[in-house]
Amino acid sequence: MNGKPAFDKPKVELHVHLDGAIRLKTVLDVAKRRGISLPVSMEEELKELCTVNEPATLTEFLGKFSHFMHVIAGDREAIKRIAYEFVETKAKEGVIYVEARYSPHFLANKGVEPLPWDQKPGDITPDDVVDLVNQGFKEGEQAFKTKARSILCCMRHMPNWSMEVVELCKKFHKDGVVAIDLAGDESMNCESYPGHKKAFEEAVRSNVHRTVHAGEVGPASVVREAVEVLKAERIGHGYHTLEDQNLYKQLLHQNMHFEMCPVSSRLTGACEPDFTKHPLITFKKDKANYSLNTDDPTIFNSTLNSDYEVVQKYMDFTEEEFKRLNINAAKSCFLPEKEKEKLLNQLYEAYGMRKSTSF
């Protein structure tokens, strides 16, 4: 990062994958401790293996996780460490509140069918994973003063995990977990995979907040399904919502929150590479409710400042717009009302705004 960040004030981040934000040095450390051999031994070499620097396909991007997830998954110390270090990283980026998402099943090695990352069976269940991440986040918050909460992900290709995910959301509802998410291949719709619909219905019944990856690479119909069938309160990405103007207008009217990830959207091929033609420009023009987020900073070799710089440089974002979108992020976050109020007050104070200032 050269010089001053694009927005040097407190920020809120709502869409970042914990397992897409792991320090590569940590991967090397843990591999050494666990006696896991990697094809490379230097951080720079591992970076070359794990990052996407030019627009790729979503499949190529997802393939990057297989280079390091097997090192972290199924190891108590490692899972807690990545959570703790995540909070440290976010604090350095000026984030005062972050919602990190992950699939508890992808970090477990017991009670998961099939076992991910070709692991041997062990003793860490998805339930243990949530507990370990919570510990790391709590210690991180004490050390770095940045508050982190979890969103647990269902995976589109694993509908048989989804009911377990919602049960974990319920179990840890008062302990660090604020919502449920659905991630993965958008072509796998909920009609064909009813496990997700069932889980999200249970989430609605149990007052578990809901966000859904939709309209990232998939069409606007996936966004409609997320809102109408899964009762999503926020949309992860949602760029392709613009292809259905009626839906877009309806969601604008409903003040639906869109978790925007500009750097990610270019590198996964979700949007065309030219940032000056990005859908976010339309969302900004229409004063939509959205946030700026990194998504998977390790894989994109980015920080939150990268996203702020990109929109400042190519989409004419101003300091005022940065304030507006962070206030919107805080208003749309999944914290309990009292904590949300406190977060908003922190932002109003830091931004020199009176509480009544409305955008």
Curated annotation (Swiss-Prot):
This chain belongs to the protein called Adenosine deaminase
How the cofactor is bound: the record states: Binds 1 zinc ion per subunit.
Which HAMAP family does this chain map to?
A: A_deaminase
The primary gene name is ada
Q: Which organism is it from?
A: Danio rerio (Zebrafish)
Keyword Chaperone listed? The answer is: no
What does the UniProt record say this protein does?
Catalyzes the hydrolytic deamination of adenosine and 2-deoxyadenosine. Plays an important role in purine metabolism and in adenosine homeostasis. Modulates signaling by extracellular adenosine, and so contributes indirectly to cellular signaling events. May act as a positive regulator of T-cell coactivation.
Q: Where in the cell is it found?
A: Cell membrane; Cell junction; Cytoplasmic vesicle lumen; Cytoplasm
Q: Which reaction does it catalyse?
A: adenosine + H2O + H(+) = inosine + NH4(+); 2'-deoxyadenosine + H2O + H(+) = 2'-deoxyinosine + NH4(+)
What does the record give as the active site?
E216 (proton donor)
Annotated GO CC locations = anchoring junction; cytoplasmic vesicle lumen; cytosol; external side of plasma membrane; lysosome
Keywords (alphabetical) are: Cell junction, Cell membrane, Cytoplasm, Cytoplasmic vesicle, Hydrolase, Lysosome, Membrane, Metal-binding, Nucleotide metabolism, Zinc
What are its E.C. numbers?
A: 3.5.4.4
Report residues binding substrate.
H17, D19, G184, D296
One of this protein's GO BP terms?
Answer: negative regulation of adenosine receptor signaling pathway
Family, as annotated: Belongs to the metallo-dependent hydrolases superfamily. Adenosine and AMP deaminases family.
Please give the cofactor(s) recorded in the UniProt entry for this protein: Zn(2+)
Query: Where is the site Important for catalytic activity?
Result: H237
List ligand-binding residues for Zn(2+): H15, H17, H213, D295
Please spell out the taxonomic lineage of the organism that makes this protein.
Answer: Eukaryota, Metazoa, Chordata, Craniata, Vertebrata
List, in alphabetical order, the Gene Ontology terms for molecular function in this entry.
2'-deoxyadenosine deaminase activity; adenosine deaminase activity; zinc ion binding
- Membrane topology term: Peripheral membrane protein
Against InterPro entries, the record matches this protein to: A/AMP_deam_AS (IPR006650), A_deaminase (IPR028893), A_deaminase_dom (IPR001365), Ado/ade_deaminase (IPR006330), Metal_Hydrolase (IPR032466)
